[in-house]
């Protein structure tokens, strides 16, 4: 696998999603990552640290440059807990849990987050503003309502299916109400 190409494709997909989701500085972007799926295997069966590191480092660098926080979701063995910067956990009063991910409990993305983040911690849950799911890891539980599906520029990253979510405020008030425009509303 060409890791430089993987990094470039990750950057292309991410740049487009950040633009279309309208996520802003100080908000949270969640990443679900199956390096097994990227490598062409079955989720949870062929974790690959090199793939996890390339993808997480690429995304973390891009988001840090824009002041957006990254939350990296773990697998179901950790109840889909997330690695975030301690600064974010403190700022949002998130409950920190005590676990260290490994390749088969948490996965390569979480290991990479622990390597590349300044002061990483695990939290059980978060309410993110947008996210990218690489390999059908089910990030929806961590994205706030109302979730809006976004089609990534690429349908796959190597062997992994890609899906993405943004979020928008709920529309309330019914037929008499007026609404402010937003860039992701579908009507």
Curated annotation (Swiss-Prot):
It comes from the Bacteria. Belongs to the UPF0340 family. HAMAP family: UPF0340 (MF_00800). NCBIfam families: TIGR01440 family protein. This is UPF0340 protein SMU_87. It comes from Streptococcus mutans serotype c (strain ATCC 700610 / UA159).
């Amino acid at each position: 696998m060409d890791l430089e190409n993987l990094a470039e494709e990750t950057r292309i997909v991410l740049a487009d999603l950040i633009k279309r989701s309208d996520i802003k500085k100080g908000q949270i972007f969640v990443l679900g990552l199956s390096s097994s799926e990227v490598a062409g295997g079955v989720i949870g069966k062929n974790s690959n640290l090199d793939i996890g590191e390339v993808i997480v480092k690429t995304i973390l660098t891009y988001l840090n440059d824009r002041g957006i926080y990254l939350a990296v979701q773990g697998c179901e063995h950790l109840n889909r807990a997330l690695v975030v910067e301690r600064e974010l956990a403190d700022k949002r009063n998130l409950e920190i849990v005590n676990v260290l991910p490994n390749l088969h409990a948490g996965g390569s993305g979480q290991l990479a987050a622990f390597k590349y983040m300044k002061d990483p911690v695990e939290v059980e849950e978060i309410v993110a503003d947008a996210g990218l799911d690489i390999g059908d890891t089910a990030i929806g539980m961590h994205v706030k309502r109302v979730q809006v599906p976004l089609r990534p520029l690429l349908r796959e990253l190597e062997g992994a299916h890609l899906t993405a979510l943004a979020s928008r405020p709920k529309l309330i008030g019914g037929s008499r109400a007026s609404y402010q425009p937003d860039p992701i509303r579908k009507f």
